[in-house]
Every structure is written in C-alpha cells, then in structure tokens.
Amino acid sequence: MKSYFYDNESDVISLDYLKEHNVLYFPMDREKENYKEPLETLCKERGYKNRDEVKLSKETPGLEDKLKIFFEEHLHDDEEIRFILDGCGFFDIRDKNDKWVKIKEKKGDLIIVPANMYHRFALDESRNIHAMRLFTDAPKWVPINRY
C-alpha cells in the first residue's frame, strides 16, 4: 500500500495520517495461506459477518460503465472494506481539509474506509483486480453520490 496527495506522488502519506482520518490498513500475506487466520480474527473483532468477491478485468462485460460508477465521488452508510486478492487499484479519499488522498492497493492489502467518508475507486493501468468485500450485514453496495 502506498498513499500520497492526489497531485504529488512523491509526497508520501503515513499510516498515522490515514488513521487520523479513520482509514485503517491491514497487510495480509497473500503468498501463503497465513492470511486466513488474521482475516477471520479481524472479521470477528469488527463484526464482519458476510463477504463476497469481485473480479474485474479487461474482459469484464461493461467494465467502463462499472468504473465510471466507482469513480463518481460518493460515500456509504457503512464502512467499505476491501481485501485485494490479486491485481491493483486506487482509492481516492477526501481528507479533513477536503484534499484528495490517493491510496494504491495491491495484492495482500486490506483497507477500511469509514462510513460517511467521500471516496472513489479506479483500477490501475493493468485493468485487473480481484477483491474480497467484507460486510457487517447482507452484502450490499449503495453509493450516495456527492453531487
């Protein structure tokens, strides 16, 4: 995981800065099966009872339309939890000063974006991601667009 201000990739942001904004990061070792126990512990501690998986690639029908929806600035009533099983993508979040922070997630990264935080999502140039989504209740994804 790497985070930086949207317009300056060399201005790296610390995990502490993300924590100040209630964005949480958990590295998971996807190269081994070792990630399963810490993942289950996290789910139990935070009350994540449900999950599903999403795969997007260049071959996904309607990919560009889906990506347009994900890239619209929005928030959710619930946390947005993503565990990247393969591929790479970017969460852009708004910090307390309304500045965009870009968070690059890759295989093995788990991020929790808090409820009611404006954000958006994009794929990297490979256009490939396989992510596990975690939920406290039934799996749902309801965006509340900013504009």
UniProtKB/Swiss-Prot annotation:
GO terms under cellular component: cytoplasm; nucleus
Source organism, top-level taxon: Eukaryota
Cofactor(s) required, per the database record: Fe(2+); Ni(2+)
Residues annotated as binding Ni(2+): 74, 76, 80, 119
Entry note: cofactor: Binds either 1 Fe or Ni cation per monomer. Iron-binding promotes an acireductone dioxygenase reaction producing 2-keto-4-methylthiobutyrate, while nickel-binding promotes an acireductone dioxygenase reaction producing 3-(methylsulfanyl)propanoate.
MF terms in GO: acireductone dioxygenase (Ni2+-requiring) activity; acireductone dioxygenase [iron(II)-requiring] activity; iron ion binding; nickel cation binding; oxidoreductase activity
Source organism of the structure: Dictyostelium discoideum (Social amoeba)
Cell location: Cytoplasm; Nucleus
Pathway named in the protein's UniProt entry: Amino-acid biosynthesis; L-methionine biosynthesis via salvage pathway; L-methionine from S-methyl-5-thio-alpha-D-ribose 1-phosphate: step 5/6
Protein's UniProt name: Acireductone dioxygenase
EC number: 1.13.11.54, 1.13.11.53
